[in-house]
Amino acid sequence: MDLNSASSVVLQVLTQATSQDTAVLKPAEEQLKQWETQPGFYSVLLNIFTNHTLDINVRWLAVLYFKHGIDRYWRRVAPHALSEEEKSTLRAGLITNFNEPINQIATQIAVLIAKVARLDCPRQWPELIPTLVESVKVQDDLRQHRALLTFYHVTKTLASKRLAADRKLFYDLASGIYNFACSLWNHHTDTFLQHVSSGNEAAVLSSLERTLLSLKVLRKLTVNGFVEPHKNMEVMGFLHGIFERLKQFLECSRSIGTDNVCRDRLEKTIILFTKVLLDFLDQHPISFTPLIQRSLEFSVSYVFTEVGEGVTFERFIVQCMNLIKMIVKNYAYKPSKNFEDSSPETLEAHKIKMAFFTYPTLTEICRRLVSHYFLLTEEELTMWEEDPEGFTVEETGGDSWKYSLRPCTEVLFIDIFHEYNQTLTPVLLEMMQTLEGPTNVEDMNALLIKDAVYNAVGLAAFELFDSVDFDQWFKTQLLPELQVSHNRYKPLRRRVIWLIGQWISVKFKSDLRPMLYEAICNLLQDQDLVVRIETATTLKLTVDDFEFRTDQFLPYLETMFTLLFQLLQQVTECDTKMHVLHVLSCVIERVNVQIRPYVGCLVQYLPLLWKQSEEHNMLRCAILTTLIHLVQGLGADSKNLYPFLLPVIQLSTDVSQPPHVYLLEDGLELWLVTLENSPCVTPELLRIFQNMSPLLELSSENLRTCFKIINGYIFLSSTEFLQTYAAGLCQSFYELLPEITTEGQVQVLKVVENALKVNPVLGPQMFQRILPCVFRGVIEGERYPVVMSIYLAVMGRVLLQNTSFFSSLLNEMGHEFNQEMDQLLGNVIEMWVDRMDNITQPERKKLSALALLSLLPSDNSVIQDKFCGIINISVEALHDVMTEDPETRTYKDCMLMSQHEEPKVTEDEEPPTEQDKRKKMLALKDPVHTVSLQQFIYEKLKAQQEILGEQGFQSLMETVDTEIVTQLQEFLQGF
């Protein structure tokens, strides 16, 4: 691409590509896409975006195309890679002038220089760093800033490289420029502090921006640039200097008010100082040891004493608390139980910590956390009134403690209390004792203090296990507080019910549950929505608890379910509806079939909620979870839900529909439990199986559930299902088998085994295409025992229950292996006998014995040759399935099932599903459970004897080991 002639053409097309008119925009984008691989295109783009007279939008687009080009074509091995000559020209052009006037474009240029540096620096671009170092020294403000901006992005990018060779290069770079970076930062910081006192706002902002950028560079060099940073005097000097600088900047915040244009940048710089300390502590805990004392003194004084008044702000307090927390919790500072096993560095750090956290310091921190930071703020109380649902779902999970004040204070309290519980337990107990009895509803401050102390007692529940008689406290103090219905008392009603939820799994007597359920029923009718939502949460914790007893809960079930349902209707926010649905699901799951009389209202409401939640996939996930538990609770009655249930399953498991990304896992689970609880198949239930084929193609972690669903259909309606879907299913399995893991192969073949078990006539025909590979696996001696076991189970089913099909399969395989049928059968029996040890389940061992015995009686010489092996297998199976009656000394087959056997269901066990009943009916027709192995062997041997005569039979029996014969005779006593 000739630069001079091409520039105007490219400029014109870029201008068209900034158009709002798609008729102009689309062809321009297409043309630019074609030019991406043209030599010289990126040189033209460089000329365009460095020409400050051109339109800003056009230059912006040129930078973006250049940046994408680096990602796609800069590497030498990339298809259509840029030539080394062009890259060399581009590198030189990028760092010729640092004079971009537009901030956004300057940032993009800095980022793309960093991208090139990641690939080429220092080997192909040794001049980059020296050029940047010189450029940040110039007097021109704009050039200096742009060079510093680029310096930061390059440092950040090089610091992020993780390969050992790249790390080594970055260490070399850091040690080479660290002194310069420190002096640069000090210079800009001093300049800023001078400007602050002069009152020149523009100069203050400009110097502060440079201070921030130079500090960002230092952060990356300090944290990522040294293997043992504590051995470098400059690094440790910089880190120690941070505390003094922080004090200076915090003092500046007194003079720079909240409405000042510099305020935001100032706070960012203060936070960046703390990030340097936090990152350094995270990456180099041992190197941080000399900084522990100073960090703790600094953080504690600003957060827990009057030193911080008037200068601290929320994000800074959070960072200081995180610094304290990371020092308290750091494993590198915790000695082993046996002190001698700990490193000197660990012992030194531990000593510094112990010297700092004295009794007075810990007591003051604990008291300040509870009486100051735990108090509900004016802002929170206003939110409670104006947006109760927003108040209840305030972010408290995951990493919120790193950024938000309330979760941060609570996590710090938990960690300090855990670490120093012997010191702090008496302090908290004393706080509790001062708050005994009811609190005056007119004294809002006293109510908030009590709320804060109760919060601490809840958070420290595990630590206070031995120190608080919670059952007594519940009866004498907490229960009466829940009964105070005054509106101003609602913070305490909410806090007390929350507190009980925290203690439920720690220490709460089972006998007190009914009293708690009574209280929950009352609070679910509280006038305040926040109290009702908190009560629902505690109900979930109570029902979820290990010691939950259904019999205690049942008297309150109807009331609670009705009130929870009302709450579900009352709340409007998606998150709150999800939360209440989870509580309902939990209740349904625990009481199971007992829920049936009370679910009518919920069943009617869920379709409406599903419709309303079209845009809220996470809420739909919660609805799916609720439906799963509902179907399990309703059992066969869940058929009445099909008009709503089946379209929901259809949508959730349709991979062509966008929502499946969120809904698939729960949708498959719902599909499975629907099948398990279905009393009979319906055309609609059969129809949604059309979704299965694409799901099998996905080969995702959901395959196991998919196989369970297929089995569910086979048990539910084998003939109809197999006639409709077996051909497609067989094709999917055929394609899937070579691609999947051993475990996956077993799952596929279990489906085939079930089809053969349920429908011995139709099954083999339907899966005809898969059976040769099973046969092949047996003949060739499949090496994985679990796979061989399932191969033999499938073969056993065909041989035992569909002999004619087995003969045709044997014939087909004879042609493939170029062997006579008898010879091939002999090889199969030999391998079967040899690999019988691969079968671990007694049912399958018995199946193998029955299958091979079914070849008898026979005058076929091959089968007679293998007679010894068949008897060996049969006796092995007898050992596994026969139990001896100690009184009569006779044996009976423990696999046999009778029509009248009803399994006893204990109170803790779930009642059998419809699928369990179908499996029981199937077992009653299965030879494994209906044919006595003892009798079968006896009859087969008798028939063989009749064919061969006494002498011939005796000769045959002599081929069997005498010990085996003795065992066989013992088992056959009485026949």
Curated annotation (Swiss-Prot):
Q: State the SUPFAM superfamilies in the record.
A: ARM repeat
The lineage's top-level taxon is Eukaryota
Its cellular-component GO annotations read:
cytosol; nucleoplasm
Q: Which residues form the Importin N-terminal domain?
A: 28-100
> According to the UniProt entry, which residues carry N-acetylmethionine?
1
Where does the protein end up? Cytoplasm; Nucleus
| Main subcellular location | cytoplasm
Entry keyword set: Acetylation, Cytoplasm, Nucleus, Phosphoprotein, Protein transport, Repeat, Transport
Gene3D superfamilies, from UniProt? Leucine-rich Repeat Variant
Quick one: a GO biological-process term for this protein?
A: ribosomal protein import into nucleus
HEAT repeat segments run: 123-160, 283-317, 318-356, 422-459, 473-509, 511-548, 555-593, 600-636, 640-677, 683-720, 731-773, 819-849, 850-887, 957-974
- Please state the span of the N-terminal signal peptide per the UniProt entry: none
For this protein, the record's InterPro entries field holds: ARM-like, ARM-type_fold, Importin-beta_N
Q: Indicate the segments annotated as coiled coil, or none if absent.
A: none
Q: Which positions carry Phosphoserine? A: 343
According to the UniProt entry, its GO molecular function terms are: nuclear import signal receptor activity; small GTPase binding
Whom does it interact with, and what assembly results? Interacts with UBE2E3 and RPL12.
What this chain does, per the record? Functions in nuclear protein import as nuclear transport receptor. Serves as receptor for nuclear localization signals (NLS) in cargo substrates. Is thought to mediate docking of the importin/substrate complex to the nuclear pore complex (NPC) through binding to nucleoporin and the complex is subsequently translocated through the pore by an energy requiring, Ran-dependent mechanism. At the nucleoplasmic side of the NPC, Ran binds to the importin, the importin/substrate complex dissociates and importin is re-exported from the nucleus to the cytoplasm where GTP hydrolysis releases Ran.
Per the similarity annotation, which family is this?
Belongs to the importin beta family.
What's the protein called, per UniProt?
Importin-11
